[in-house]
Amino acid sequence: MDPSTLLLFVIIAAGLIVLSIFFTFVPVMLWISALAAGVRVSIFTLVGMRLRRVIPNRVVNPLIKAHKAGLDVTINQLESHYLAGGNVDRVVNALIAAQRANIELNFARCAAIDLAGRDVLEAVQMSVNPKVIETPFISGVAMDGIEVKAKARITVRANIERLVGGAGEETIIARVGEGIVSTIGSSNNHKRVLENPDMISQTVLGKGLDSGTAFEILSIDIADVDIGKNIGAILQTDQAEADKNIAQAKAEERRAMAVAQEQEMRAKVEEMRAKVVEAEAEVPLAMAEALREGNIGVMDYMNIKNIDADTDMRDSFGKMTKGPSDNENK
């Protein structure tokens, strides 16, 4: 091969390599698009984005969109927001929507809301078109013990000034639920709640439940009211059952005490019988001592023995006459 031809191929290959590297690091088509849209962006700025690991499309395209919408936004602002982890395209869309709706919102405020984790575009849309939040059935018990269940629809509008640091939808639902329970609980009769469901919405709406939240409550409407259980009757039944169990326990305790007392009295009777037997065992000793000392004579002793014999005989007769009658009764 001719050396000049070989050199030409080498030059062409080197040129292709240089061009591929150039188009890799320099988004020429994006730069041309920006120039065609009237956005002046330096080619070196795009190269610097590549070096800073910033995707140029994520910054330049929103910049073109903002320029066409007449927003005063610089490429440095968009790039810094991208580097901070924000969604540049959503911020620009929110600024455009706010401008069209005559809502005062600057780039710094919008970027802060986006970095706080809020959907700033949705917030702007909610400022124009309020959102309806539907609560689940919330139960409350009136003073007559009847459970009343109510479901509410809350119409809210986003408050852009309080999006950063303001509470979300869960707080709104919790506060409205608390107000519904309080209103139902303060009613003397559940029929009053059924007849005037707007009483709940008026009472709850007048409490200023949107303070400290990212929303402004426009209206609270009671969508449905239903009757639940008779909580008062259930509580009374449970209380009666508990009282019955307590009374039964006390009766069982008294019965056990009576049985114990009966056993104790039987033990005392046996103890007294033992003492009687012990005393009877000492009688012959006492009589022998009396005879020895001459306190009683032989005739006195014989009379005592005769009396004992008569007593034993009467006892035996009594047992004989008592036995047949007991058998007949049995």
From Swiss-Prot:
The chain crosses the membrane at residues 6-26, 28-48. One of its GO terms (cellular component) is plasma membrane. Found in functional membrane microdomains (FMM) that may be equivalent to eukaryotic membrane rafts. FMMs are highly dynamic and increase in number as cells age. Flotillins are thought to be important factors in membrane fluidity. Belongs to the flotillin-like FloA family. It is found in: Cell membrane; Membrane raft. It comes from the Bacteria. This is Flotillin-like protein FloA. The keyword Membrane applies. The keyword Transmembrane helix applies. Homooligomerizes. Keywords: Cell membrane, Membrane, Transmembrane, Transmembrane helix. The gene is floA. It comes from Bacillus pumilus (strain SAFR-032). Its main location: membrane. NCBIfam families: PRK13665.1.
